[in-house]
């Protein structure tokens, strides 16, 4: 018995030491947070994020901690939470709904809404997944109750506003995943009459922020479906402009074998960067027009073929990525020599970021 008592004392001593270390860790984290606030309090943008993190501490844990799912668990529940984690991952099985009575007399759109299974999502960290309630997608009563803002109580309205703010925070990063179900993939088991999803589907939302308007542009969407046999994703539908080779990017991601969520994110990131590149080119020319450096601006959808006027001189550019690779000056009014035209055309080639400076200096001598 003495050995058991010794072991029990050792365990209690270790637990006490662990608790002491955890308290020290929390104090250090608080000091670091206070120091960061003091150093960056002059920056209004940083202060806005700090206020947001204070309002949603789970978001702060999700972004800055390695294991946010354990931060919300008190000391007594840590060992229990770790013990509950299965040794092997549990395969995803969508919940089933019982077959409705008299469903044959329902309109098709109502039948789909009433019989589709609960939307499942596994794209978010477990620490915040419970905050993203998808019941509103499948429950008409909940959707009606949520959308009637005037009829809900103050506490419910505040809770709904918090959900909206949290969703907007995630969408700020430009790439978000969301769950959805294609009604075509809903099947009925002959024996039990239960509804199940034949294959998974994943939605990707891409939103590019415009610094010129301080707003997000119209979002683009990509829908992926899973192949039943190979369990890999394939490109189903998208709203990306045709000048971006979405299928080529998808086929080039991991050799065309997009299996995991990480693979899907890498594909989405490559498409997103091309959208950002197009928006950046458009923004540069729109800013030049707003500053009245150029006028009568004409852009194609890709913002690669560009024409504009500087005073009464027409300039045509061909832009690739962030570089001006071709320039033509078209003028029938001024008596320019071909040699001078060529010099000005060569001068405008190069980085798009230097275009404003070049226009101000290269063309200044023309109008003296």
Curated annotation (Swiss-Prot):
Keyword Cell division belongs to the record: yes
UniProt xrefs under Pfam families: CENP-O
Modified residues (Phosphothreonine): 88
Coiled coil: 1-43
Domain of life: Eukaryota
Keyword Phosphoprotein: yes
Cellular component GO terms held in the UniProt record: COMA complex; kinetochore
Gene Ontology BP terms: attachment of spindle microtubules to kinetochore; cell division; centromere complex assembly; establishment of mitotic sister chromatid cohesion; negative regulation of meiotic DNA double-strand break formation involved in reciprocal meiotic recombination; protein localization to chromosome, centromeric region
Keyword annotations of the record: Cell cycle, Cell division, Centromere, Chromosome, Coiled coil, Kinetochore, Meiosis, Mitosis, Nucleus, Phosphoprotein
InterPro entries according to UniProt: CENP-O (IPR018464)
Known partners and oligomeric status: Component of the heterotetrameric kinetochore subcomplex COMA, which consists of AME1, CTF19, MCM21 and OKP1. The COMA subcomplex is part of a larger constitutive centromere-associated network (CCAN) (also known as central kinetochore CTF19 complex in yeast), which is composed of at least AME1, CHL4, CNN1, CTF3, CTF19, IML3, MCM16, MCM21, MCM22, MHF1, MHF2, MIF2, NKP1, NKP2, OKP1 and WIP1. COMA binds the centromeric nucleosome-binding protein MIF2, and to the outer kinetochore MIND subcomplex.
Note: Present with 952 molecules/cell in log phase SD medium.
Family per record: Belongs to the CENP-O/MCM21 family.
Record-given protein name: Inner kinetochore subunit MCM21
Gene behind the chain: MCM21
């Amino acid at each position: 018995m003495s050995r058991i008592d010794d072991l029990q004392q050792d365990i209690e001593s270790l637990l006490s030491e662990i608790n002491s270390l955890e308290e020290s860790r929390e104090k250090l984290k608080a000091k670091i947070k206070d120091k960061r606030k003091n150093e960056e309090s002059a920056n209004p943008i940083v202060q806005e994020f700090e206020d947001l993190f204070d309002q949603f501490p789970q978001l702060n844990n999700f972004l800055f901690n390695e294991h946010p799912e354990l931060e919300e668990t008190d000391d007594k529940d840590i060992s229990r939470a770790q013990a509950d984690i299965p040794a092997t991952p549990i395969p995803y099985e969508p919940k089933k709904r019982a077959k409705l009575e008299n469903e044959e007399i329902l309109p098709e759109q109502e039948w789909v809404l009433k019989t589709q299974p609960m939307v499942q999502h596994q794209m978010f960290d477990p620490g915040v997944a419970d905050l993203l309630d998808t019941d509103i997608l499948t429950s008409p009563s909940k959707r009606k109750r949520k959308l009637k803002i005037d009829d809900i109580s103050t506490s419910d309205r505040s809770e709904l506003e918090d959900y909206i703010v949290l969703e907007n925070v995630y969408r700020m990063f430009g790439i978000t995943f969301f769950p959805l179900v294609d009604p075509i993939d809903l099947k009925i088991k002959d024996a039990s009459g239960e509804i199940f999803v034949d294959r998974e589907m994943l939605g990707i939302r891409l939103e590019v922020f415009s610094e010129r308007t301080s707003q997000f542009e119209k979002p683009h969407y990509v829908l992926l479906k899973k192949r039943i046999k190979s369990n890999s994703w394939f490109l189903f539908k998208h709203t990306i402009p045709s000048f971006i080779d979405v299928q080529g990017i998808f086929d080039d991601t991991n050799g065309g074998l997009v299996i995991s969520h990480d693979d899907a994110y890498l594909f989405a990131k490559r498409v997103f960067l091309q959208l950002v590149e197009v928006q950046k080119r458009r923004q540069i020319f729109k800013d030049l027009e707003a500053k009245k450096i150029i006028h009568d601006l004409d852009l194609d959808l890709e913002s690669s073929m560009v024409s504009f006027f500087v005073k009464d001189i027409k300039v045509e550019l061909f832009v690739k990525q962030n570089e001006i690779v071709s320039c033509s000056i078209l003028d029938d009014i001024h008596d320019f020599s071909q040699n001078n035209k060529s010099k000005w055309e060569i001068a405008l080639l190069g980085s798009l970021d230097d275009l404003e400076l070049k226009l101000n200096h290269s063309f200044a001598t023309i109008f003296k």
